[in-house]
């Protein structure tokens, strides 16, 4: 039987999709290998949120062609490029909701035939059977597919489709089975995770799902992302406040500090409304760790607009910030109607300014951890040789350890702080 390697680009949802694809391929007898060189077939699970990520997978296709590998494409790149990928030597293209049909595409490719499959088969996935995960203690769990927001810069609604929630019972059954298999942490995923349940019309919601999940004894920590400000219910904040299992990290992308730019982005809230929401969350969850996303250099962004973003970053003091320079994505509203009129040199300068500002904020916030004892779940070994884990506020703490600690709760006393990771010594294994 042919050996298959799956290379995953992009978001955590792609990670989960790759796990699902591996399940279906192994069910049909294919061998999954972590070594691309050993594989007869290489499937790229692609991302096109930014041009850089799209360029990466196209470059990878070129390398694989030289090796005469059978190439398959899944993920958002498959949805965006579709049959155009055949011109690059790709043998099959699988849409984001057609993963259960991937063995059929592989079989056809082995027999020299091309496939482009874009059917919606997500309702056929029996997630409770998919117990094999990339981590032995943590699982990504997609609870809602797609997005209805249509931000003008974003390709996701076109590649992932409209919002579609999974049944709550199905999700809980999956978590219970994963818990029995040794999983201790779960992360609920959605392009707009707060919208979970709204399309089901049966009372399902993210807050209710979190409430049910915390009662599963073996599950020690529950994460969720990514949130959209106008869909974030304070019921979610109350669940976070009332449970020691639900993480205090709330990722709430703002994207910009100027109302003019937010309107142009079709973000559907004002900066005043965003700040009010953050204040409300912090009243309910005083130790909440708020992280966010910001885009610099969006069309028509003036120096005044940029300064409003700077002021926002200074005032909110995000624990973490994902920064991106705007790049037009073909097929989006911004690509079609807005001129990309902020010079690259100015975009780069603005990006660097906020990056340095955020580093200073991180450094100040992290100093509060010095000499404190923190409970973390150990994740893996870093390139530095140190092991690391995260606390309930998503702080990364590195320490001397060994692989027997992976997946375990430990107490670490913080001895050193930086703008990035914290460093400490193990006090106790829990």
UniProtKB/Swiss-Prot annotation:
Pfam families: Radical_SAM (PF04055), TRAM (PF01938), UPF0004 (PF00919). Disulfide bonds: none annotated. Residues 2-111 form the MTTase N-terminal domain. It catalyses: N(6)-dimethylallyladenosine(37) in tRNA + (sulfur carrier)-SH + AH2 + 2 S-adenosyl-L-methionine = 2-methylsulfanyl-N(6)-dimethylallyladenosine(37) in tRNA + (sulfur carrier)-H + 5'-deoxyadenosine + L-methionine + A + S-adenosyl-L-homocysteine + 2 H(+). Its EC number is 2.8.4.3. Residues 367-428 form the TRAM domain. Binds 2 [4Fe-4S] clusters. One cluster is coordinated with 3 cysteines and an exchangeable S-adenosyl-L-methionine. Its main location: cytoplasm. It is found in: Cytoplasm. [4Fe-4S] cluster 2 binds at residues 147, 151, 154. SMART domains: Elp3. Residues 133-364 form the Radical SAM core domain. Its cofactor is [4Fe-4S] cluster. Keywords: 4Fe-4S, Cytoplasm, Iron, Iron-sulfur, Metal-binding, S-adenosyl-L-methionine, Transferase, tRNA processing. GO terms for cellular component: cytosol. InterPro entries: Elp3/MiaA/NifB-like_rSAM (IPR006638), Methylthiotransferase (IPR005839), Methylthiotransferase_CS (IPR020612), Methylthiotransferase_N (IPR013848), Methylthiotransferase_N_sf (IPR038135), MiaB_methiolase (IPR006463), rSAM (IPR007197), rSAM_horseshoe (IPR023404). Catalyzes the methylthiolation of N6-(dimethylallyl)adenosine (i(6)A), leading to the formation of 2-methylthio-N6-(dimethylallyl)adenosine (ms(2)i(6)A) at position 37 in tRNAs that read codons beginning with uridine. Monomer. HAMAP family: tRNA_metthiotr_MiaB (MF_01864). This is tRNA-2-methylthio-N(6)-dimethylallyladenosine synthase.
